[in-house]
């Protein structure tokens, strides 16, 4: 045997770098060639055994129970704080899957790796690097063939391989999987509301007269909505609405004719078209019905406090409501007849004798341009001291005093007046005698404003 100090010192380095390729020195002679080869082989085997005992390869890592316990102590479990739904789905997974990817190396680890790299170039790796390699080998999904190649490499190649095997750092702009977002109470209500809207959007509209149908069961079949009925109902509603608008337009036209012309022209209009008076009366009643107090009811209340023997003449009676409300005998006059008790005539010329009635009533009937003729006719049929009651829309009076002075010139005096109502004024006059002025005298106070209705 011969001493070989150089081989003994270089053995650890060769063990760290990889498999040693033996190159024996050239033999001095052909005779000693076989013996020297055997000696070299024995030396190499001894060196290999020594290197394997000092630096066990990372490939021969056995998942023994002791290593598992050490790994569990060093790498504690990381609790996952996902939502309840995510926790239920992840209960069956392994504990190693619960752990996140290995954290990125810090600056200290990078420096330590550089030092280890230098030590690997010099001769050997530290024990801490071996442990770190074992952990990375267990966690990283690397094939066995690639792992064997990377373990044997040292130097710059080994450093590049370790950097490529490390998990990449997550950039701040990159999106990471997040646990499912839980909805707030307001968002949940909005979502339910949108669902109901989408559900009702495709349901057919129900007819208002019909009750909501019961929900169909699995056995019963859903009958299609009859389109003809809904179409006819809509058409009928449209016709009724158009007819109502047409009636309103005709009422406004008739009302304008009554206030802008004499009573004789209005009488001819209703004689030619009897239905026009019915239409006008229906529109008039719909307007007066909205008032808090109707003037005919107020006049009837006053007359009920007087003797029932007094004879009453109702100029412009309409539907004879005053005659139906009191016990007194009543003469009803109007341009058209809505009741058998009505006498159709021009109110400027009623078929009564002179001084034959005790009370004359004009309830919203001073219409037309010849109001003076109406009041002179009332003076003719009233007894001396008879009562004249006038109720008219308050908006028609520009000046109440001028109206009262004009009426007194026609043979009356004012007894009482009520201007408190917001819709109409009520006056009581008493006959004092015949008119004080001639028929050609002009009385400007009797020119009232026409009561015109606006389009609604």
From Swiss-Prot:
Q: Which GO terms describe its molecular function?
A: histone H3K9me2/3 reader activity; methylated histone binding; methyltransferase activity; RNA binding
Q: Which terms under GO biological process does the entry name? A: cellular response to glucose starvation; energy homeostasis; intrinsic apoptotic signaling pathway by p53 class mediator; methylation; negative regulation of cell cycle; negative regulation of DNA-templated transcription; rDNA heterochromatin formation; regulation of G1 to G0 transition
Matching entries from SUPFAM superfamilies are given as:
S-adenosyl-L-methionine-dependent methyltransferases
- Indicate where this protein resides in the cell: Nucleus, Nucleolus
Query: Domain of life here?
Result: Eukaryota
**Which top EC class applies here?**
transferase
Tell me the disulfide pairings in this chain: none
Q: Where is the composition biased (Basic residues)?
A: 183-200
Pfam families in UniProt: Methyltransf_8
Residues that coordinate or bind S-adenosyl-L-methionine: 281, 316, 334, 346-347, 363
* Gene Ontology CC: chromatin silencing complex; cytosol; eNoSc complex; nucleolus; nucleoplasm; plasma membrane; rDNA heterochromatin
As for family, the record states:
Belongs to the methyltransferase superfamily. RRP8 family.
* Functional summary from the UniProt entry: Essential component of the eNoSC (energy-dependent nucleolar silencing) complex, a complex that mediates silencing of rDNA in response to intracellular energy status and acts by recruiting histone-modifying enzymes. The eNoSC complex is able to sense the energy status of cell: upon glucose starvation, elevation of NAD(+)/NADP(+) ratio activates SIRT1, leading to histone H3 deacetylation followed by dimethylation of H3 at 'Lys-9' (H3K9me2) by SUV39H1 and the formation of silent chromatin in the rDNA locus. In the complex, RRP8 binds to H3K9me2 and probably acts as a methyltransferase.
Protein name stated in the entry: Ribosomal RNA-processing protein 8
Q: Which organism is it from?
A: Homo sapiens
- Which gene is transcribed and translated to give this protein? RRP8
């Amino acid at each position: 045997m011969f001493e070989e100090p150089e081989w003994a010192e270089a053995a650890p380095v060769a063990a760290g770098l990889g498999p040693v390729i033996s190159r024996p020195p050239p033999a001095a002679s052909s005779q000693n060639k076989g013996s020297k080869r055997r000696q070299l082989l024995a030396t190499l085997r001894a060196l290999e055994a020594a290197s394997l005992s000092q630096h066990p390869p990372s490939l021969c890592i056995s998942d023994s129970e002791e290593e598992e316990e050490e790994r569990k102590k060093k790498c504690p479990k990381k609790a996952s704080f996902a939502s309840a739904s995510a926790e239920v789905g992840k209960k069956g997974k392994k504990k190693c899957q619960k752990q996140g990817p290995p954290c990125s190396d810090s600056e200290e680890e990078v420096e330590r790796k550089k030092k280890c790299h230098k030590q690997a170039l010099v001769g050997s790796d530290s024990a801490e690097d071996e442990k770190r390699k074992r952990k990375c080998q267990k966690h990283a999904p690397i094939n066995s063939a690639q792992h064997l190649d990377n373990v044997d490499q040292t130097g710059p190649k080994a450093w590049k391989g370790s950097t490529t095997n490390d998990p990449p750092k997550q950039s701040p702009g990159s999106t990471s999987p997040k646990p499912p977002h839980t909805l707030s109470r307001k968002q949940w209500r909005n979502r339910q509301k949108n669902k109901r809207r989408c559900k009702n959007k495709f349901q057919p509209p129900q007819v208002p007269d019909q009750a909501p149908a019961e929900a169909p069961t699995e056995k019963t079949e859903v009958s299609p909505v009859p389109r003809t009925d809904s179409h006819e109902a809509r058409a009928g509603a449209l016709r009724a609405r158009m007819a109502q608008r047409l009636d309103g337009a005709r009422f406004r036209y008739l009302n304008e004719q009554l206030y802008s012309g004499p009573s004789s022209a209005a009488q001819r209009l209703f004689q030619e078209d009897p239905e026009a008076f019915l239409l006008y009366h229906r529109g008039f009643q719909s307007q007066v019905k909205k008032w808090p107090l109707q003037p005919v009811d107020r006049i009837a209340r006053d007359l009920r406090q007087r003797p029932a023997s007094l004879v009453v003449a109702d100029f412009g009676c309409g539907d004879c409501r005053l005659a139906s409300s009191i016990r007194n005998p009543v003469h009803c006059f109007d341009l058209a007849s809505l009741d058998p008790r009505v006498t159709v005539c021009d109110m400027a010329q009623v078929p009564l004798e002179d001084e034959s009635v005790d009370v004359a009533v004009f309830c919203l009937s001073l219409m037309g341009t010849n109001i003076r003729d109406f009041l002179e006719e009332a003076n003719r049929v009233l007894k001396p001291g008879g009562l004249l009651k006038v109720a008219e829309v308050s908006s028609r009076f520009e000046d109440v005093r001028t109206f009262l002075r004009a009426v007194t010139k026609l043979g009356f005096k004012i007894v009482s007046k009520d201007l408190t109502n917001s819709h109409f004024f009520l006056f009581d006059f008493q006959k004092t005698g015949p008119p004080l002025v001639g028929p050609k005298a002009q009385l400007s106070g009797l020119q009232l404003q026409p009561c015109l209705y606006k389009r609604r």
